[in-house]
Amino acid sequence: MAKKVVAVVKLQCPAGKANPAPPVGPALGQHGVNIMAFCKQYNEATAAQAGLIIPVEITVYEDRSFTFVTKTPPAAVLLKKAAGIETASGTPNKKKVGKVSRAKVQEIAEMKMKDLNAASIEAAMRMIEGTARSMGIEIV
């Protein structure tokens, strides 16, 4: 018989650097999950992607066991890395903070394709371009 799901917790943690401090500790502690076990497994699973923020969806079961699925990093994080900027523009329509090539946008769209609800790579690219525009990044 399948285990009964108690909760689904969504978090965004730095790859390979999850620790029991907030936000991980309080989010999982209230469901009775072994926080250190999660941190250890998450850090092993994301060690190769160090420096990126990785969204994770943790499914907590009735017996306090858990499973988790890691997603691709948010488009905004990938765009900031590609443009070589620290923060996005506060006024994106007036002040541009960086430039990203169409080839780089396509690369990001291909990486994120499985997490986006886009039918084609072109549609995924348009979504990524929209994110870039709202951050003040020019597409060249």
Curated annotation (Swiss-Prot):
SUPFAM superfamilies: Ribosomal L11/L12e N-terminal domain (SSF54747), Ribosomal protein L11, C-terminal domain (SSF46906). It holds the Pfam family Ribosomal_L11_N. One of its GO terms (biological process) is translation. The keyword Ribonucleoprotein applies. One or more lysine residues are methylated. It comes from the Bacteria. Keywords: Methylation, Ribonucleoprotein, Ribosomal protein, RNA-binding, rRNA-binding. Forms part of the ribosomal stalk which helps the ribosome interact with GTP-bound translation factors. Part of the ribosomal stalk of the 50S ribosomal subunit. Interacts with L10 and the large rRNA to form the base of the stalk. L10 forms an elongated spine to which L12 dimers bind in a sequential fashion forming a multimeric L10(L12)X complex. PANTHER family: 60S RIBOSOMAL PROTEIN L12 (PTHR11661), LARGE RIBOSOMAL SUBUNIT PROTEIN UL11M (PTHR11661:SF1). This is Large ribosomal subunit protein uL11. It comes from Heliobacterium modesticaldum (strain ATCC 51547 / Ice1). The gene is rplK.
